[in-house]
Structures are given as C-alpha cells and as structure tokens.
C-alpha cells in the first residue's frame, strides 16, 4: 500500500503579499495559516499515518510540524518536495506575468521565458518522492508540486491543468499504486475516504 496525502502549506506572509519564492526562506505562516494547519491535523485524526515529510521551505515545514505534533511524530525534509524552480520569477509577484484576462498560475510559453523548472522535471521528482514509501504518508509541499502530481496521474500537462487551484492547507489524497485520486484539494476527510484508507 502506498497512499500519499499531499497537503499544501498554510497561508504565509508572502502569500498575502502575492510574492513568489522557491528558496529556503524565513517567511512565516500567518495566524490564519497556523489555524489552517491545525484544522488539517484535526481532519487527519484517526488515520494511521506512518510518517510526515516536508519541503525544506519554512512555510511548508512549519505547517508539517504543527500537523505532525498532533501525532507525536517528527517531520523529515525531502528536497524533492521543494517549490517549483521559479527562475527569473523568484521574488516577484505572479500578477506581473499574466495578460490581464486570467489570474493564478504562470502558464504556457512564459514559463520558458522565465527559465522556470520544466513541468516534467517537477512531476518526476514529486512522484518519485511519494512512490518511494510504503504505508499512508503525509507530504507537505506547495501548490505547483501538488498540481504536478495530480497532472501526472491524470496524464495531463501543465497547461491542461491550469484550472486546478490548490488552496492553502488543502489535502489531495492519492493511491499511488493504482494511480487513483481520492480527493483533490479537499479541506475535510470524508467518511468514504476514511473507509478506503482503513481497509487498505
């Protein structure tokens, strides 16, 4: 059994400012972000989680720590869970790179112009991380790495999954062995998902 519970970090101060960052920084969770992490921890109660893994970036690690503390477990950092390489977009605002019609992800050819990490590279490292461990494990990471994992199992590219918006502290559950996506950016663990996890 290989079940991955992918959780985006809670709201951070740079989320509020709209700034992009892929570095191991000192950006903090907001008070709201900490409450979001506590909510995720409460939703995971009763699930037999083996281990907790996190991107080394502070906003993700702090989220993972809040959740893992409620299970009396440690957090292990995994470089493969780090934010997408942002290239020339690092430290800038995402809305600088949209055409005014749409907001959200940086998409299409502009990603190449900004020398961002290639989507297939991001997919490869994230999927390797979640496929390498047995049991039910939690992986706290960032929006694009989660979107990349989802797009991998849906056999889609970056542009085909532009509309996927992974909210702060939301949970995406994937049965990695069979490629089944059980939740997509959920904020609660439903009875049907709990039942599935408990019978694996």
Curated annotation (Swiss-Prot):
Gene3D superfamilies: Phosphoglycerate mutase-like (3.40.50.1240)
Catalysis: reaction(s): (2R)-2-phosphoglycerate = (2R)-3-phosphoglycerate
GO cellular component terms given for this protein: cytoplasm
MF terms (GO), sorted A to Z: phosphatase activity; phosphoglycerate mutase activity
Pfam families: His_Phos_1 (PF00300)
Keyword terms, alphabetized: Glycolysis, Isomerase
GO biological process: glycolytic process
Pathway annotation from the record: Carbohydrate degradation; glycolysis; pyruvate from D-glyceraldehyde 3-phosphate: step 3/5
The keyword Isomerase is annotated on this UniProt entry: yes
InterPro entries in the cross-refs: dPGM_arch (IPR054929), His_Pase_superF_clade-1 (IPR013078), His_PPase_superfam (IPR029033), PG/BPGM_mutase_AS (IPR001345), PGM_Phosphatase (IPR050275)
Catalytic residue list: 9 (tele-phosphohistidine intermediate), 142
PROSITE patterns per record: PG_MUTASE (PS00175)
EC number: 5.4.2.11
Quaternary structure (record): Homodimer.
Protein name listed in UniProt: 2,3-bisphosphoglycerate-dependent phosphoglycerate mutase
Species of provenance: Thermoplasma acidophilum (strain ATCC 25905 / DSM 1728 / JCM 9062 / NBRC 15155 / AMRC-C165)
């Amino acid at each position: 059994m290989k079940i991955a519970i992918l959780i985006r970090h809670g709201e951070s101060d740079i989320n509020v400012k709209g700034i992009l960052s892929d570095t191991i920084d000192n950006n903090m969770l907001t008070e709201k972000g900490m409450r979001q992490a506590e909510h995720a921890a409460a939703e995971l109660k009763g699930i037999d989680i083996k281990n907790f893994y996190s991107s080394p970036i502070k906003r993700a690690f702090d989220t993972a720590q809040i959740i893992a503390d409620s299970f009396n477990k440690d957090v292990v950092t995994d470089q493969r869970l780090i934010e997408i390489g942002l290239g020339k977009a690092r430290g800038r605002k995402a809305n600088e790179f949209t055409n005014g019609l749409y907001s959200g992800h940086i998409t299409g050819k502009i990603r190449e112009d900004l020398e961002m990490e290639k989507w297939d590279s991001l997919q490869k490292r994230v999927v390797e991380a979640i496929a390498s461990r047995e049991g039910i494990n939690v992986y706290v990471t960032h929006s694009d790495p989660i979107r990349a994992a989802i797009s991998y199992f849906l056999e889609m590219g970056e542009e085909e999954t532009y509309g996927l918006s992974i909210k702060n502290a939301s949970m995406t559950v994937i049965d990695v062995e069979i490629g089944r996506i059980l939740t997509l950016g959920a904020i609660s663990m439903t009875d049907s998902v709990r039942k599935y996890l408990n019978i694996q």
